[in-house]
Amino acid sequence: MLSDKGKYASATENRRFVWQEIIWPLILEINDVSFSLKQYQKKRDQVCEVKGVEASTTSRGLVSLLQKGILFKENALYSIHYRLIAYMRLKADCNYATAIHEVRMSG
């Protein structure tokens, strides 16, 4: 997916892909601010099959979203940042750029 990019561009692209193709659609689908690892894995597998992407690429993106503060992990659940809840309630598009902007505005 990202072989010809530098390390930082590759990490950003992994985060962007995981957020826009897996996490945000999952959040809208389940209509909840949190999801389990099992729910994530099911959605990831569906997306990876359709897009032809390795699951290992998406795991790096998930960890990176945790490090950026867009996602939080508590016990067995992953949750979105509180500033993104309004987007979920409105069923609005929340791309990676919007998500990172909202998270940075809070801190």
Description of each model-found segment:
Residues A76-R83:
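Minor-groove-contacting beta-hairpin "wing" of winged helix-turn-helix DNA-binding domains
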Residues D32-Q46:
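Short acidic, hydrophobic short linear motifs in intrinsically disordered regions
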Residues E49-V53, Y87-R89:
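Short acidic, glycine/proline-enriched loop segments that cap or flank alpha-helices
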Residues I85-G107:
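Short, amphipathic alpha-helical interaction segments positioned at domain boundaries
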Residues K51-Q67:
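Short amphipathic alpha-helical interaction segments
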Residues M1-S34:
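Short alpha-helical segments that sit at the start of domains
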Residues L66-A76:
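A short, conserved structural fragment
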